Amino acid sequence: MITDVQLAIFSNVLGVFLFLLVVAYHYINANTGKSSIKNK
């Protein structure tokens, strides 16, 4: 079985990964939005 410590580590790693994924998505989305306005 999964211990409490293993579950806590897994949930923390998953949370950090999802947070970084959201930050990367917004960073890429913001940069492509600005460059498309400049090209018009």
From Swiss-Prot:
Provide Cytoplasmic-side residue ranges: 26-40
Q: Where in the cell is it found?
A: Endoplasmic reticulum membrane
Disulfide bond sites: none
Question: What is the membrane topology listed in the Swiss-Prot or TrEMBL record?
Answer: Single-pass type III membrane protein
Keywords from UniProt, A to Z, are: Endoplasmic reticulum, Membrane, Signal-anchor, Transmembrane, Transmembrane helix
Query: Which residue windows are transmembrane per the record?
Result: 5-25
Q: Which SUPFAM superfamilies match?
A: Oligosaccharyltransferase subunit ost4p (SSF103464)
Q: Which GO terms describe its cellular component?
A: oligosaccharyltransferase complex
- Establish whether keyword Transmembrane is in the entry: yes
One of the GO BP terms on file: protein N-linked glycosylation via asparagine
Q: Which Pfam families match?
A: Ost4
* Lumenal side stretches: 1-4
Q: What's the stated role of this polypeptide?
A: Subunit of the oligosaccharyl transferase (OST) complex that catalyzes the initial transfer of a defined glycan (Glc(3)Man(9)GlcNAc(2) in eukaryotes) from the lipid carrier dolichol-pyrophosphate to an asparagine residue within an Asn-X-Ser/Thr consensus motif in nascent polypeptide chains, the first step in protein N-glycosylation. N-glycosylation occurs cotranslationally and the complex associates with the Sec61 complex at the channel-forming translocon complex that mediates protein translocation across the endoplasmic reticulum (ER). All subunits are required for a maximal enzyme activity.
What family does the entry list? Belongs to the OST4 family.
On subunit structure and binding partners, the annotation says: Component of the oligosaccharyltransferase (OST) complex.
Q: What is this protein called?
A: Dolichyl-diphosphooligosaccharide--protein glycosyltransferase subunit 4
